Amino acid sequence: MDKLCGTLFVYRGNTFDYCFKEAIQCLLEFCDHVVVAAGGDDGTLEYVMDIAEKNEGKINVIVITKEEWEGQSGREKLNYFTNVAIQYADKLGFQYNFNLQADEIVHEKSYAVIREAIQTNEESYMCTRINLWKSPYMQLNVPQERKPCSTQVLRLGKISCRSYGDAESLMAHTCTFDFTDRIRIYHMGFVRKQDVMRSKIINMQVDVFGMEHYDSKLDESELFNPDLWFDPKTDIKPIDEPLPKLIQDWASKRVYKN
């Protein structure tokens, strides 16, 4: 019985160097079906439509128009479009949803674990997220209060669970941690192409979150300099395992100069 739908949204994924192509392929590997909300004027939608055509019957695409995108504001904009995909999956009749962001990849070792987890019929399942920094092969190693985003996120839940806030997690009444260590999501968002990072952060902070001013550290270097935020000698460490296979080629082309 088909019971697990993967969901994802992406807007202008090419412009801001999201690994959305790999993320969609990742969901196809372990989900029964995938719903993608996509848009933008940079070829993102066309690519998603193309991969949907190649996987006929397994992907539904919801078009995000420019007017719809600009009609939402604040960090809740992210959960709004995430929920567009989740609500569509709900209408299709799926029991569970795995929500992945367009700059994330699930490790292939976790595919079977996710399928195992949903057989236990819990409402939701906490997942581990590895936040990469400076290099696709290094991860942040600082206290949670210093991290730019969480290392535990709720992304697997019954289809009634909706995204909230800045879409970091789903909302649920109950959550199990029984599978947390084995469901591993790699966050590539801070290791995009170095010449894209500055504009990406400004776009997110100003155009999405609605901040009056973006982080002033961005003006201290022409190219994004990750060392301005975290000391490479003390604040990062090597990842604990090889990167997910689907992202290895992408990662090899994104090693920073400094």
How should each PLM-predicted stretch be described?
Residues L8-F16, H33-T44, I239, K245-A251, ...:
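Glycosyltransferases that elongate glycans
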